C-alpha cells in the first residue's frame, strides 16, 4: 500500500511575489501550485493508493475562488485516477469559533468521490486499491470551540493548553486501542510535538501552541504517524515512523536552508503491526530558492557599492528571492548606491530587501577624522533613516538629540 504524505501547501501565501501578466495572479501562487503538481504527478505515475494532506491547504480560512479552483483541480486529478485523498483541517483551514465551515467542507458537501475530510478527532476507514486503511484524524483544535464545550475561560492560556493536551492524549489513546490490528493504521495530525524544531532551530517548547508528547502519538498500533503544521521536514521517531514532511515551498527567509518535499511510505497490509513498513523516502521538490547575501563594508573601502556587487557575483541569484544585508560604518552609508545593487540582481525573481545596518567605526578613524566626515546630528539622522523611523517619533528623537548635543557642546566649553 503506497501512501503519499504532504502538508502545509498553503495556497494563498504571496510574500515576495510579483504579478504574473498571463494569469493576473501572484507569481508565488504559481510557485505553490507547481510543487503541489509535483506531488500529484508523483502520486499518479506511481499509482499511489492514498494521499494524506495533513493540514493547511490554504493560507486563510476564506480562500479566494481562484485558490479554491486551483486546489480542487489537483484534488480532482488524484480522485479521478482512483487515488484516495484524505484532507485534514489545519489551523489555517479552520475558523476560531464553532459554526462556520472550514475551508475544506466544500468537498464532503459536494460528495466528491474518493475524497475524505478530517475535521474532528475520530477514526476513519478508507478503502484503497490495496485494501482498507484506518486513519485516526487529529485536526487542529480550535481553542474557542474547546473552551465553549468545557465552559472554561481563556484567562489562563497555560491551563487551557494543558487541558487540550490531556484530552487529546486520552482521545488518541482510546482511538488507537479501538483499532483493528488486522488492518493497517495511520495517524494524521496537524499539531505540535514537544521534540520538534522550527526552521529557525527553535524548540517548540518556546512557543504558545499546545504540545503533545511524542510518546502520546508514537503508539505501537500505528504503522505511520503523518503530521503537519511545522514547516521543517523532520523525523521524530522510527518505529512507528513519526514525520513532518514540512511545507512544499519556503514561506520566508527563516526557511532558506530547509529542504522541501513530501514523504512516501510503502506498507505491507499482510504483516502485523510494527512490521508493515516496506520502505520510506523523502522526495524533494523544486521549491523556489531563498538567498541571503551578506557584505561588510570597512571604513577604508573606496567603493562600497562595487564591493557589494562583487559579493553578489559570487552567488547564483537567478530566479531566487533575495535579501542583501550590508554592515556599514556611518561614514560609508551615503556611498552605497541601492539602485546599482538592485541592478546587479536583475536576474533574481524578487529582491525582498537591501538593508544597511550601521556598525561602529574603527578606532583609528575615530576622533577628528570621523568628525570631519559626519556630524553627530547627521549620524543620528542616518541611523533613524536606516531604522525606518519617520513622522512624529523621528521629530521627537531628533529634537532630543539636538538638545543632548547642545548640552554636551556647552559642557565642553565650560
Regions of interest found by a model, annotated:
Residues 8, 36, 51, 56, ...:
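Divalent metal-coordination and catalytic microenvironments
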Residues 1-74, 392, 400-402, 406-414:
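N-terminal active-site segment of His-dependent metallophosphoesterases
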Residues 1, 49, 83, 131, ...:
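Short coil/turn segments at beta-strand junctions that form active-site/ligand-binding loops
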Residues 50, 63, 81-243, 250:
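His/Asp/Glu-rich metal-coordinating catalytic cores
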Residues 38, 69-77, 102-105, 170, ...:
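Alpha-helical scaffolding segments of alpha/beta enzyme cores, especially the outer helices
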Residues 66-72, 204-211, 338-342:
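Charged helix-capping and loop-helix junction motifs
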Residues 215, 219-301:
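A conserved active-site cap/scaffold subdomain adjacent to cofactor or substrate pockets
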Residues 267-414:
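Accessory, non-catalytic peripheral segments of nucleic-acid enzymes
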Amino acid at each position: 500500500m503506497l501512501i503519499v504524505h504532504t502538508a502545509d501547501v498553503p495556497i494563498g501565501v504571496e510574500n515576495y511575489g510579483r504579478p504574473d501578466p498571463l494569469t493576473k495572479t501572484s507569481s508565488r501562487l504559481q510557485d505553490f501550485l507547481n510543487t503541489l503538481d509535483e506531488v500529484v504527478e508523483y502520486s499518479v505515475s506511481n499509482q499511489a493508493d492514498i494521499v494524506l494532506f495533513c493540514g493547511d491547504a490554504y493560507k486563510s480560512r476564506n480562500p479566494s475562488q481562484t485558490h479554491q479552483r486551483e486546489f480542487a483541480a489537483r484534488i480532482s486529478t488524484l480522485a479521478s485516477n482512483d487515488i484516495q485523498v484524505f484532507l485534514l483541517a489545519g489551523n489555517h483551514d479552520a475558523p476560531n469559533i464553532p459554526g462556520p465551515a472550514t475551508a475544506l467542507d466544500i468537498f464532503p458537501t459536494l460528495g466528491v468521490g474518493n475524497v475524505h475530510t478530517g475535521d474532528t478527532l475520530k477514526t476513519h476507514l478508507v478503502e484503497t486499491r490495496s485494501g482498507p486503511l484506518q486513519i485516526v484524524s487529529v485536526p487542529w483544535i480550535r481553542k474557542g470551540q474547546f473552551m465553549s464545550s468545557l465552559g472554561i475561560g481563556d484567562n489562563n492560556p497555560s491551563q487551557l493548553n494543558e487541558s487540550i493536551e490531556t484530552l487529546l492524549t486520552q482521545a488518541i489513546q482510546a482511538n488507537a486501542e479501538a483499532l483493528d490490528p488486522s488492518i493497517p493504521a495511520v495517524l494524521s495530525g496537524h499539531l505540535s510535538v514537544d521534540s520538534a524544531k522550527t526552521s529557525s532551530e527553535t524548540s517548540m517548547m518556546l512557543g504558545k501552541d499546545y504540545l503533545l508528547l511524542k510518546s502520546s502519538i508514537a503508539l505501537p498500533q500505528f504503522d505511520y504517524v503523518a503530521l503537519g503544521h511545522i514547516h521543517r521536514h523532520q523525523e521524530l521517531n522510527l518505529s512507528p515512523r513519526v514525520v513532518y514532511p514540512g511545507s512544499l515551498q519556503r514561506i520566508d527567509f527563516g526557511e532558506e536552508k530547509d529542504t522541501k518535499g513530501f514523504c512516501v511510505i510503502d506498507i505491507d497490509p499482510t504483516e502485523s503491526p510494527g512490521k508493515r513498513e516496506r520502505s520510506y523516502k523523502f522526495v524533494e521538490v523544486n521549491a523556489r530558492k531563498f538567498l541571503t547575501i551578506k557584505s561588510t563594508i570597512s571604513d577604508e573601502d573606496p567603493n562600497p557599492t562595487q564591493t557589494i556587487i562583487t559579493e553578489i557575483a559570487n552567488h547564483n541569484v537567478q530566479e531566487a528571492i533575495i535579501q542583501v544585508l550590508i554592515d556599514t560604518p556611518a561614514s560609508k552609508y551615503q556611498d552605497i548606491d541601492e539602485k546599482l545593487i538592485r541592478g546587479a540582481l536583475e536576474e533574481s525573481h524578487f529582491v525582498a530587501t537591501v538593508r544597511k545596518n550601521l556598525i561602529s567605526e574603527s578606532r583609528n578613524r575615530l576622533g577628528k577624522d570621523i568628525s570631519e566626515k559626519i556630524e553627530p546630528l547627521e549620524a543620528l539622522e542616518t541611523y533613524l533613516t536606516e531604522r525606518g523611523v519617520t513622522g512624529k517619533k523621528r521629530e521627537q528623537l531628533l529634537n532630543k538629540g539636538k538638545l543632548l548635543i547642545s548640552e554636551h557642546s556647552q559642557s565642553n566649553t565650560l
